[in-house]
């Protein structure tokens, strides 16, 4: 590129009676400036046109690392003993954030998922809200929220009281998860809501990275407008999904092998990239849309103890919402 500039300046120099030496020096200067401008245009190119380099937002990020190698950053408390043991628990989100038992994801990593921002997790007197926004975070164009229970949990019953986020392109989720980063193959059990159609809840599971099948369970209500309780029983040879205590679907080991590895328990709000659009819809959701979670519980197989369903009444809960 500097060559044509040099030749042009030589021509101009001859026209304005510049010496060859002066024209050469001007050519070199303008060539450097032009190359710098072109480099700047690459560095400020629109999202997606520049090479992507993804790095953690937090160098002490614990999510997606092997459980035995999770670092404890300065000022971050050690895991509570009950969480480390994968014990039964119930957590009302109005009680706020307990960093010895819960983790706010604050990172980006190479995947179709958005960035996860801790500041998109909002606590209120009776709930936590996860927020999804269109914003640039590193190479990501979207920023959602992920909240993890610390520790690894095995067979038992998981319950959640929640309202998913509305809007095409959103995915509000409760799920168990483990993978190679935790020292095991990819196992996962899902309860997910697609904001494009909130008259259904979806269910699936993965065993050693292989999916079962995608289930769409119809609901007689718009899940974003009413509070309800969703649950699954995870047993060695079957999984059963429930809505407000009513059994909706059963998968058995004969259908597809059941996950066997202890896993994290996670809630998320996210939207994916182009390859997910056919599934979750175009991302036309209102910026700042939120999913609300009120209570979550895990009752380990063989245990007795409190669960969200002990005190949750969907009729009373939604009558109260209507009154407000």
Residue ranges, per PLM feature:
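Bacterial N-terminal signal peptides that target proteins for export
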Residues: 20-29
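Hydrophobic membrane-insertion alpha-helices, especially the h-region
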Residues: 29-40
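N-terminal secretory signal peptides that target proteins for export/translocation
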Residues: 1-21
């Amino acid at each position: 590129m500097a060559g044509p500039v040099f030749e042009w300046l030589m021509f101009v120099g001859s026209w304005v009676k510049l010496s060859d030496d002066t024209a050469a020096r001007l050519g070199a200067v303008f060539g450097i400036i032009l190359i710098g401008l072109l480099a700047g245009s690459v560095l400020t190119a629109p999202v997606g046109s520049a090479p992507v380099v993804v790095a953690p937002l937090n160098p002490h990020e614990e999510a997606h690392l092997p459980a035995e190698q999770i670092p404890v950053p300065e000022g971050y408390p050690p895991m509570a003993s009950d969480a480390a043991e994968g014990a039964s628990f119930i957590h009302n989100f109005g009680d706020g954030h307990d960093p010895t038992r819960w983790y706010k994801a604050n990172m980006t990593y190479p995947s179709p998922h958005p960035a996860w921002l801790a500041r998109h997790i909002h606590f209120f007197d009776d709930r936590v809200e996860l927020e999804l926004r269109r914003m640039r975070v590193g190479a990501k164009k979207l920023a959602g929220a992920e909240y993890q229970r610390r520790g690894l949990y095995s067979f038992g019953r998981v319950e959640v009281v929640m309202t998913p986020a509305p809007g095409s392109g959103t995915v509000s989720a409760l799920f168990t998860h483990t993978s190679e980063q935790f020292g095991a193959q990819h196992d996962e059990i899902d309860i997910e809501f697609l904001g494009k159609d909130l008259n259904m809840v979806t269910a699936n599971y993965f065993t050693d990275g292989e999916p079962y099948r995608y289930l769409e369970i119809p609901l007689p209500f718009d899940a974003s407008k009413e509070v309800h309780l969703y649950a699954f029983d995870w047993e060695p040879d079957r999984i059963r999904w429930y809505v407000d205590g009513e059994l909706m679907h059963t998968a058995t080991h004969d259908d597809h092998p059941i996950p066997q590895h202890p896993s994290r328990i996670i809630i998320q709000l996210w939207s994916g990239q182009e390859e997910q659009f056919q599934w979750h819809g175009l991302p036309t959701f209102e910026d700042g849309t939120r999913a609300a979670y009120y209570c979550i519980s895990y009752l380990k197989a063989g245990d007795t103890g409190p669960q969200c369903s002990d005190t949750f009444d969907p009729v009373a809960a939604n009558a109260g919402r209507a009154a407000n």
